[in-house]
């Protein structure tokens, strides 16, 4: 590709205030276990759906999607990654298994012990690891704008540049257009919302495990929710997951979207998630 430029028990859940109001009420709670605390934004009532954000970004990215899912009859849970907001815990010498444990604790305490896990970009790795490690808690897995098994290294460079606050806006916008936003979609919405201080920790957690430990996403039904113009999963890799895992995989492709997907086409994401989840047993 051409480069653009050179185990301990769950201890408690604590009410922690009220966030922006929605029809079903948006609220914040804290899930605590061992030396970890996870801040969770919750809204809606119904079957639980957990939304996990992209690398070095917050679950706030899902605001519109969460509101849409809540209106569609779901209990939407958005755990903030360690190091963001009031989510705390070890940031070094951790693996993807530890981050998956955070999500499992949220599902057990706030999701009635069973949930659909949606992971966007980096979050899809956490979602798959959660499903592999804690299959009884996972009703289904959605990998949204998930990268192919192998992708061009300059895309990783672009992701780093997009969230590098020391670079000029022009440099960051170039990276956002290259790796994240389809032509005609506004990349400026992602000039903010980055937490570069957690990026290395998150990447190290993935690097500490073998890809085959999480790649399958367990055995639950899996939705491969793709963006039509995502360079991390070009059209030639469209059926990669289904070819490997067969009928448990459903492929849906959202047009006019790239790797960012969530801010690009929130309504289409809500519609796709709702349609697929409502067909689950």
Regions found by a protein language model. Give the residues of each.
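A short loop-to-beta-strand scaffold at the N-terminal edge of the catalytic core in hydrolase folds
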Residues: 33-42
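Catalytic nucleophile serine of serine hydrolases
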Residues: 121
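Flexible "cap/lid" loop of the alpha/beta hydrolase fold
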Residues: 125-132, 140-167
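Conserved alpha/beta-hydrolase catalytic His-Asp/Glu region
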Residues: 152-153, 157, 164-218
